[in-house]
Design a protein with these regions (language model features):
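Amphipathic alpha-helical interaction surfaces in cytosolic regulatory modules
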Residues: 1-11, 25-41
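Short glycine-rich, basic-tinged beta-strand/loop micro-motifs
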Residues: 11-22
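Small/polar loops that bind or transfer phosphate-bearing groups
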Residues: 21-24, 45
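C-terminal structural segments of small proteins and small subunits
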Residues: 31-60
Length: 60
């Protein structure tokens, strides 16, 4: 679900804006890496605090 919500949010954003996504699913780490490559958006970073996974994506 976080990936779908991120796609929807990015569609409403202007180029250069940064989206922060916080997820609880460990699989989101790989999902957002693949999404960034496929979509052409830039994955600025990811963090893992053990229970949540944060992702920063820059709209291309």
């Amino acid at each position: 679900m976080p990936l779908l919500k991120a796609k929807q949010a990015l569609n409403r954003m202007d180029v250069g804006q940064i989206l922060e996504v916080i997820a609880t699913d460990q699989g989101s780490v790989r999902d957002f890496q693949v999404f960034a490559v496929q979509s052409g958006n830039e994955l600025l970073g990811q963090t893992d605090d053990g229970s949540t996974y944060s992702h920063w994506i820059k709209k291309a």
